[in-house]
């Protein structure tokens, strides 16, 4: 057979020495899963996936974490190293916060969440903490993991305020903004009914102001698709749902990803209905810091 006649891949990604992925997908999380699959046979009984790698295995959001390298924790060593495809960490003795997920060695859910929360900002930390609780992590275990060390203060704030009712990372980011901007805390996943029965459940609800807040994302709507439905069908159903709620004298504010990432956008949209009052939610200064947390001087 003439191999020269075969189509050549448009792109090739190195997973590890001697192993490549042709035409890698655009989704960096999917690419990282391929990296993990390539690295798995190389791990011995003293090695565990950690940080962003463990986060993907557990189902935690990873945000802007380093997905270009596989993150591996080796027990019984003292020095780590970084290569083009791996970031290796060492610990002198085997810590208690290691586990198996579907036969794969990883840091525990609480340890993984803590590792990720410490190295990002308060908003993403809250999203990670929310997801950890939703996946079954106990709050006390998470609080124990984030205690002390780099990034502990904002991570502790996030662990204290985490809520398993938050259904998506963007809902968590909205709630983080609510806390940071001194807005009243809403009820989460509140349900509404009318004379015809159940209408639906909303992301946020402020009873005092009869105000509903919802994050709109394409992933959210595609997840609502029934067999044979189009996205337009879902959008129409959502419009009917909103009209029924508005008939209950409810007001709506909606946000997309651009609003979440635009400073002041969420606060401005809510204050149109609730006024200018500011509530001190008691966040530590680090939870108001929009810079990535850095190591403290010794």
Task: Report residues per predicted region.
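Short gly/ser-rich loop at a beta-strand->alpha-helix junction or flexible surface loop bordering the NTP-binding
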Residues: 1-151, 275-298
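Surface segments flanking catalytic/ligand-binding clefts of nucleic-acid enzymes
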Residues: 133-298
């Amino acid at each position: 057979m003439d191999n020269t006649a075969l189509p050549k891949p448009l792109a090739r990604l190195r997973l590890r020495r001697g192993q490549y992925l042709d035409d890698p997908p655009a989704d960096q999380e999917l690419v990282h899963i391929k990296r993990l699959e390539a690295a798995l046979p190389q791990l011995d009984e003293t090695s565990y996936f950690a940080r962003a790698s463990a986060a993907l295995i557990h189902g935690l959001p990873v945000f802007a974490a380093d997905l270009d390298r596989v993150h591996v924790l080796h027990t019984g060593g003292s020095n780590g190293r970084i290569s083009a495809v791996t970031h290796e960490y060492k610990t002198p003795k085997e810590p208690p916060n290691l586990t198996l997920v579907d036969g794969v060695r990883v840091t525990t859910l609480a340890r993984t969440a803590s590792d990720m929360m410490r190295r990002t900002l308060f908003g993403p930390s809250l999203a990670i903490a929310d997801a950890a609780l939703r996946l079954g992590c106990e709050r006390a275990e998470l609080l124990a993991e984030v205690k002390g060390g780099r990034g502990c203060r904002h991570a502790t704030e996030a662990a204290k305020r985490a809520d398993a009712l938050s259904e998506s990372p963007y809902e968590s980011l909205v709630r983080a903004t609510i806390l940071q901007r001194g807005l009243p805390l809403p009820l989460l996943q509140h349900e509404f009914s009318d004379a015809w029965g159940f209408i639906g459940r909303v992301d946020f609800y402020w009873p005092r102001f009869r105000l509903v807040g919802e994050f709109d994302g394409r992933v959210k709507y595609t997840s609502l698709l029934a067999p044979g439905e189009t996205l337009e069908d879902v959008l129409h159903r959502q419009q009917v749902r909103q009209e029924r709620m508005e008939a209950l004298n409810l007001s709506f504010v909606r946000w997309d990803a651009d609003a979440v990432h635009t400073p002041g956008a969420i606060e401005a949209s809510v204050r149109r209905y609730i006024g200018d009052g500011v509530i001190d939610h008691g966040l530590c200064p680090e939870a108001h810091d929009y810079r990535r947390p850095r190591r403290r001087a010794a």
